[in-house]
Amino acid sequence: MHVVDMVFHWARVDPHRPAIISPDLITTFAGLAEAIDSISNRIDQLGLDPSEPVATVIGNPALSIAIAFALQRSGFSVAPANRGLIKHLQPNGIRNLIYDVEGFVASGGRNIRFDNSWLPPPSSTPTSRAYRRRPVGDVDLIYFTSGTTGLPKKFVQSRRGMDAHLLRFAADATRQSALIVSGLTGALGVNFTCEILYSGKTVCRAPTPQAMLELVGLFQIDTMVGSPQQVLGLTALKELRPDLPVDSLQTIIMAGATIGRRGIDRIRATLCRTVINAYTSTEASLAALAPYDLIEGIPGAVGFVAPWAEVEIVDNAGNPVPNGRDGIIRYRTPRFSPKSGAVTDQWFYPGDIGHLTDDGILCVVGRTSDVINIGGVKIYARNIEELVETMEDVREAAACGVKDAAGVEQLWVAVVPNGTVDGEALKARIQAHPGVSGHLSELFVVPELPRGDLGKVQKVRLKELLIGLVGTT
């Protein structure tokens, strides 16, 4: 059953239960179903072709969810977007846009302005409404994922893939409410939102870190979902504001980027002891997961391979290698579909290098695009980053390879400092470390690292930034 059908189910079974909580609005399941029904009726009057997907740029999270669900109920595939993605819509075959802020329009196709007339009138008895029986058909969700490149790539998540995902993850009876920190334009935020609503529980969203932590205390939220960088941002705020109560948090689920031991220790000491790492992708969903308690002593460990996932480590020729030996990671899951585009011989290649242990733990040592070859010496950027981030005066680090005028690759490192830092002294300390062995060519102190929606450092943008800094010195 589709998540939209389940919303209508819960609207009948438990109509007054909050479905979506934000700082200025509580939307019950009955209210959400009413909104979906009314918006779906309006969409039917627009004369759109159901074979063409529709993008949405809606600021209010409850309305964004309601409009996306209404489109699916009316038979349309949906592309949740933001202002920065509008220019990428038409080149990717998406000509129709529903938006709520003037100026958020795309060239060509239909630009449809949403307003409150699409919503049902206030009613004192919303549960008495007789909803049309209209099961959701075979519709897709369309995402644009940038990963570490910063360049948006279109990905299509099929109805079948979403159904398989929900059947596997929406049965957690212990979770009552979840603060979804990740945005509603990416698979992580959308999938977790659908999981929570599918199971009749409550999704919580807020626009700022302070408002998020205030919601946790006010509504006794038990679960938090986000990228490591998003959760670290909330950790930093809690360290500054110890008066904000977060005692109700029982679990934090993080996915999308890597995080060092020091960051994990801060999160567990400040927000919640139970932190679960998820190794996942927009294209093929979850492949491995584990509480950090179980993997914290294993270098590069990202989780135990999930029972539904098939993970292989292969060499450059595609031949499987033994456990313990590094190679190219590939995997497939029931949600994975060749329709997604990032496919070779029915496997998904996330672009990571790593190995499997005999206990079924997946360990990641770097990216295939992040192997820096310095005169024949191969260095994993991730190893350098983890090494530098152990230094007390460094909050974040990112390494990349940049070719000099002769075409020889050099190791460049950018750091975000903890307070003030002596760049030359830090560079000397890094150079002297056995893991670097004098290979560092340039060190840059920057206020922040360029990151995508899930917190991954975007290495293409990083290189452009650092090359620009060299050009100005």
What are these regions (language model features)?
Residues 1, 116-139, 152, 166:
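Flexible, low-complexity linker/hinge segments
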Residues 8, 16-47, 55-61:
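Conserved AMP-binding/adenylate-forming core of the ANL superfamily
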Residues 28-30, 132, 140-167:
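Conserved AMP-binding A3 loop
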Residues 163-177, 185-223, 237:
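Conserved AMP-binding/adenylation subdomain of ANL enzymes
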Residues 222-223, 239-297:
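Gly/Ser/Thr-rich phosphate-binding loop
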Residues 224, 351-438, 448, 455, ...:
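AMP-binding/adenylate-forming catalytic core of the ANL superfamily
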Residues 298, 312-331, 358-359, 419-423, ...:
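Conserved beta-loop-beta connector loops within the AMP-binding
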Residues 304-308, 319-348, 361, 377-379:
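Conserved ATP/PPi-binding loop(s) of AMP-dependent carboxylate-activating enzymes
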